[in-house]
Amino acid sequence: MSGHSKWATIKRKKDAIDSKRGAIFTRVGKEITVAAKMGGGDPEGNPRLRLAILKAKSVNMPKDNIERAIRKGTGELEGVTYEECLYECFGPGGIAIMVSAVTDKKSRTTPEIKSILTKLGGSLATSGSVSRLFEKKGVIVLESSQISEDELVDVAVGGGAEDVINEGDVYRVISVPDNYETVLHALNEKGLKSEESEIRYIPLVSSEIADKEVAEKIMKLIDQLDGHDDVTSVTSNFELASSLEKEFE
Protein backbone atom coordinates (compact mmCIF):
# COMPACT_ATOMS: atom_id res chain seq x y z
CA MET A 1 0.00 0.00 0.00
CA SER A 2 2.96 2.32 0.63
CA GLY A 3 3.73 2.82 -3.05
CA HIS A 4 0.13 3.71 -3.81
CA SER A 5 0.13 6.08 -0.85
CA LYS A 6 3.29 7.79 -2.09
CA TRP A 7 1.60 8.38 -5.45
CA ALA A 8 -1.44 9.71 -3.61
CA THR A 9 0.86 12.10 -1.76
CA ILE A 10 2.47 13.29 -5.00
CA LYS A 11 -0.96 13.87 -6.49
CA ARG A 12 -2.19 15.60 -3.32
CA LYS A 13 0.68 18.11 -3.54
CA LYS A 14 -0.19 18.81 -7.16
CA ASP A 15 -3.87 19.21 -6.36
CA ALA A 16 -3.04 21.67 -3.59
CA ILE A 17 -1.51 23.90 -6.25
CA ASP A 18 -3.96 23.30 -9.10
CA SER A 19 -7.33 22.99 -7.41
CA LYS A 20 -9.73 25.92 -7.15
CA ARG A 21 -11.83 26.42 -4.06
CA GLY A 22 -14.95 27.15 -6.12
CA ALA A 23 -14.70 23.80 -7.89
CA ILE A 24 -14.28 21.99 -4.57
CA PHE A 25 -17.33 23.73 -3.12
CA THR A 26 -19.36 22.82 -6.22
CA ARG A 27 -18.47 19.14 -5.87
CA VAL A 28 -19.19 18.99 -2.16
CA GLY A 29 -22.38 20.98 -2.65
CA LYS A 30 -23.65 18.39 -5.12
CA GLU A 31 -22.95 15.61 -2.61
CA ILE A 32 -24.92 17.48 0.07
CA THR A 33 -27.83 18.05 -2.32
CA VAL A 34 -28.00 14.38 -3.29
CA ALA A 35 -27.80 13.28 0.35
CA ALA A 36 -30.61 15.67 1.35
CA LYS A 37 -32.75 14.54 -1.59
CA MET A 38 -32.37 10.86 -0.68
CA GLY A 39 -32.68 11.06 3.10
CA GLY A 40 -34.13 14.44 4.05
CA GLY A 41 -32.60 17.69 5.25
CA ASP A 42 -32.08 16.78 8.92
CA PRO A 43 -28.49 15.59 9.45
CA GLU A 44 -29.45 13.98 12.77
CA GLY A 45 -31.71 11.54 10.96
CA ASN A 46 -29.66 11.35 7.76
CA PRO A 47 -26.18 9.89 8.36
CA ARG A 48 -25.17 10.41 4.76
CA LEU A 49 -26.03 14.10 4.91
CA ARG A 50 -24.21 14.39 8.21
CA LEU A 51 -21.03 12.99 6.64
CA ALA A 52 -21.38 15.27 3.60
CA ILE A 53 -21.63 18.27 5.91
CA LEU A 54 -18.54 17.12 7.81
CA LYS A 55 -16.71 16.92 4.49
CA ALA A 56 -17.90 20.43 3.59
CA LYS A 57 -16.66 21.79 6.89
CA SER A 58 -13.29 20.10 6.41
CA VAL A 59 -12.74 22.20 3.25
CA ASN A 60 -14.04 25.35 4.99
CA MET A 61 -17.20 25.58 2.92
CA PRO A 62 -19.29 28.55 4.14
CA LYS A 63 -22.37 27.76 6.21
CA ASP A 64 -24.63 29.58 3.73
CA ASN A 65 -23.40 27.35 0.90
CA ILE A 66 -24.08 24.23 2.96
CA GLU A 67 -27.60 25.33 3.88
CA ARG A 68 -28.38 26.30 0.28
CA ALA A 69 -27.25 22.88 -0.96
CA ILE A 70 -29.49 21.19 1.61
CA ARG A 71 -32.51 23.28 0.58
CA LYS A 72 -31.93 22.37 -3.06
CA GLY A 73 -32.01 18.70 -2.12
CA THR A 74 -35.20 18.99 -0.09
CA GLY A 75 -36.92 21.00 -2.81
CA GLU A 76 -37.14 24.24 -0.83
CA LEU A 77 -35.05 25.94 -3.50
CA GLU A 78 -35.44 25.48 -7.22
CA GLY A 79 -32.50 23.95 -8.99
CA VAL A 80 -31.25 21.10 -11.11
CA THR A 81 -31.74 17.48 -10.07
CA TYR A 82 -28.57 15.49 -9.43
CA GLU A 83 -27.93 11.76 -9.51
CA GLU A 84 -24.96 9.64 -8.55
CA CYS A 85 -22.88 7.66 -11.02
CA LEU A 86 -20.17 5.09 -10.34
CA TYR A 87 -17.82 4.17 -13.17
CA GLU A 88 -15.66 1.05 -13.03
CA CYS A 89 -12.69 1.44 -15.35
CA PHE A 90 -9.44 -0.07 -16.52
CA GLY A 91 -6.43 2.12 -17.27
CA PRO A 92 -3.03 1.74 -18.96
CA GLY A 93 -1.09 -1.25 -17.71
CA GLY A 94 -4.34 -2.93 -16.65
CA ILE A 95 -4.78 -0.85 -13.50
CA ALA A 96 -8.24 -0.62 -11.95
CA ILE A 97 -9.96 2.74 -11.41
CA MET A 98 -13.13 3.69 -9.55
CA VAL A 99 -14.70 7.02 -10.53
CA SER A 100 -17.53 8.53 -8.48
CA ALA A 101 -19.58 11.37 -9.97
CA VAL A 102 -22.65 13.46 -9.29
CA THR A 103 -24.37 14.83 -12.38
CA ASP A 104 -27.50 16.57 -13.55
CA LYS A 105 -27.33 14.72 -16.87
CA LYS A 106 -25.91 11.19 -16.95
CA SER A 107 -26.30 11.04 -20.74
CA ARG A 108 -23.70 13.81 -20.95
CA THR A 109 -21.32 12.69 -18.23
CA THR A 110 -20.96 9.03 -19.26
CA PRO A 111 -19.78 9.73 -22.84
CA GLU A 112 -17.37 12.37 -21.52
CA ILE A 113 -15.84 9.95 -19.02
CA LYS A 114 -15.63 7.29 -21.73
CA SER A 115 -13.90 9.76 -24.07
CA ILE A 116 -11.25 10.62 -21.48
CA LEU A 117 -10.59 6.93 -20.89
CA THR A 118 -10.37 6.07 -24.59
CA LYS A 119 -7.96 8.90 -25.41
CA LEU A 120 -5.55 7.85 -22.66
CA GLY A 121 -5.56 4.07 -23.02
CA GLY A 122 -8.40 3.22 -20.65
CA SER A 123 -11.88 1.76 -20.94
CA LEU A 124 -15.13 1.36 -19.06
CA ALA A 125 -15.47 -2.04 -17.39
CA THR A 126 -18.50 -4.24 -16.73
CA SER A 127 -20.25 -3.80 -13.40
CA GLY A 128 -18.50 -5.69 -10.60
CA SER A 129 -15.31 -6.45 -12.51
CA VAL A 130 -13.43 -3.56 -10.89
CA SER A 131 -15.37 -2.81 -7.70
CA ARG A 132 -14.49 -6.26 -6.34
CA LEU A 133 -10.86 -5.09 -6.22
CA PHE A 134 -11.71 -2.28 -3.78
CA GLU A 135 -13.34 -1.74 -0.42
CA LYS A 136 -14.90 1.33 1.14
CA LYS A 137 -13.00 2.97 3.97
CA GLY A 138 -13.05 6.22 5.87
CA VAL A 139 -9.94 8.20 4.90
CA ILE A 140 -8.74 11.29 6.77
CA VAL A 141 -5.58 13.13 5.72
CA LEU A 142 -3.87 15.65 7.98
CA GLU A 143 -0.54 17.45 8.06
CA SER A 144 2.03 15.66 10.21
CA SER A 145 3.34 18.94 11.65
CA GLN A 146 0.25 19.07 13.90
CA ILE A 147 1.00 16.02 16.03
CA SER A 148 3.50 13.20 16.60
CA GLU A 149 2.78 9.82 15.06
CA ASP A 150 2.57 8.06 18.43
CA GLU A 151 0.10 10.61 19.80
CA LEU A 152 -2.01 10.45 16.64
CA VAL A 153 -2.15 6.65 16.82
CA ASP A 154 -3.47 6.89 20.39
CA VAL A 155 -6.15 9.41 19.42
CA ALA A 156 -7.16 7.76 16.14
CA VAL A 157 -7.22 4.16 17.36
CA GLY A 158 -9.05 5.31 20.48
CA GLY A 159 -11.69 6.73 18.16
CA GLY A 160 -11.99 3.49 16.22
CA ALA A 161 -9.42 3.85 13.42
CA GLU A 162 -7.88 0.74 11.86
CA ASP A 163 -4.58 2.21 10.77
CA VAL A 164 -2.45 5.35 10.67
CA ILE A 165 -0.07 5.66 7.72
CA ASN A 166 2.89 8.04 7.97
CA GLU A 167 3.59 9.51 4.52
CA GLY A 168 6.16 12.06 5.65
CA ASP A 169 4.45 15.44 5.46
CA VAL A 170 0.99 13.95 6.04
CA TYR A 171 -0.70 11.17 7.98
CA ARG A 172 -3.47 9.09 6.46
CA VAL A 173 -5.97 7.74 8.99
CA ILE A 174 -8.01 4.72 7.84
CA SER A 175 -11.22 3.39 9.38
CA VAL A 176 -14.20 1.24 8.51
CA PRO A 177 -17.10 3.41 7.26
CA ASP A 178 -19.14 2.87 10.43
CA ASN A 179 -16.33 4.36 12.57
CA TYR A 180 -15.45 7.23 10.24
CA GLU A 181 -17.58 9.86 11.98
CA THR A 182 -16.32 8.83 15.43
CA VAL A 183 -12.69 8.99 14.32
CA LEU A 184 -13.17 12.39 12.70
CA HIS A 185 -14.83 13.67 15.87
CA ALA A 186 -11.92 12.39 17.99
CA LEU A 187 -9.42 14.21 15.76
CA ASN A 188 -11.50 17.41 15.83
CA GLU A 189 -11.73 17.24 19.62
CA LYS A 190 -7.94 17.13 19.69
CA GLY A 191 -7.87 20.34 17.64
CA LEU A 192 -6.52 18.62 14.53
CA LYS A 193 -7.47 19.96 11.11
CA SER A 194 -7.86 17.57 8.17
CA GLU A 195 -6.90 18.37 4.59
CA GLU A 196 -9.16 15.64 3.23
CA SER A 197 -11.83 13.52 4.86
CA GLU A 198 -14.28 11.20 3.16
CA ILE A 199 -15.53 7.65 2.77
CA ARG A 200 -14.03 6.35 -0.45
CA TYR A 201 -12.89 3.24 -2.28
CA ILE A 202 -9.37 2.03 -1.59
CA PRO A 203 -7.66 -0.90 -3.34
CA LEU A 204 -7.45 -4.34 -1.77
CA VAL A 205 -4.36 -5.13 -3.85
CA SER A 206 -2.09 -2.65 -5.62
CA SER A 207 -0.83 -2.95 -9.20
CA GLU A 208 2.83 -1.91 -9.46
CA ILE A 209 3.89 -0.04 -12.59
CA ALA A 210 7.62 0.13 -13.39
CA ASP A 211 7.35 1.50 -16.94
CA LYS A 212 7.79 5.29 -16.95
CA GLU A 213 5.67 5.92 -20.05
CA VAL A 214 2.81 3.81 -18.72
CA ALA A 215 3.04 5.56 -15.34
CA GLU A 216 2.88 8.97 -17.05
CA LYS A 217 -0.23 7.92 -18.98
CA ILE A 218 -1.86 6.69 -15.79
CA MET A 219 -1.13 9.93 -13.98
CA LYS A 220 -2.46 11.99 -16.88
CA LEU A 221 -5.59 9.85 -17.04
CA ILE A 222 -6.26 10.15 -13.32
CA ASP A 223 -5.70 13.91 -13.43
CA GLN A 224 -8.11 14.35 -16.33
CA LEU A 225 -10.77 12.17 -14.73
CA ASP A 226 -10.39 14.02 -11.45
CA GLY A 227 -10.60 17.33 -13.28
CA HIS A 228 -14.01 16.57 -14.79
CA ASP A 229 -16.63 18.90 -13.32
CA ASP A 230 -18.99 16.09 -12.33
CA VAL A 231 -16.39 13.79 -10.75
CA THR A 232 -16.25 13.76 -6.95
CA SER A 233 -13.49 11.19 -6.43
CA VAL A 234 -11.07 8.96 -8.33
CA THR A 235 -9.33 5.97 -6.78
CA SER A 236 -7.01 3.50 -8.47
CA ASN A 237 -4.89 0.52 -7.47
CA PHE A 238 -1.90 2.08 -9.23
CA GLU A 239 1.36 1.70 -7.32
CA LEU A 240 4.41 3.53 -8.59
CA ALA A 241 7.49 1.28 -8.54
CA SER A 242 10.18 2.49 -6.15
CA SER A 243 12.61 2.73 -9.08
CA LEU A 244 10.46 5.51 -10.56
CA GLU A 245 9.65 7.52 -7.44
CA LYS A 246 12.42 10.08 -7.93
CA GLU A 247 11.21 10.67 -11.50
CA PHE A 248 7.93 12.08 -10.20
CA GLU A 249 9.00 14.01 -7.11
From Swiss-Prot:
Gene Ontology cellular-component annotations: cytosol
Similarity-based family: Belongs to the TACO1 family.
Protein name: Probable transcriptional regulatory protein LA_0720
GO biological process: regulation of DNA-templated transcription
Localization annotation: Cytoplasm
Keywords linked to the UniProt accession: Cytoplasm, DNA-binding, Transcription, Transcription regulation
Source organism superkingdom: Bacteria
InterPro entries: Integrase-like_N, TACO1_YebC-like_2nd/3rd_dom, TACO1_YebC_N, Transcrip_reg_TACO1-like, Transcrip_reg_TACO1-like_dom3, YebC-like
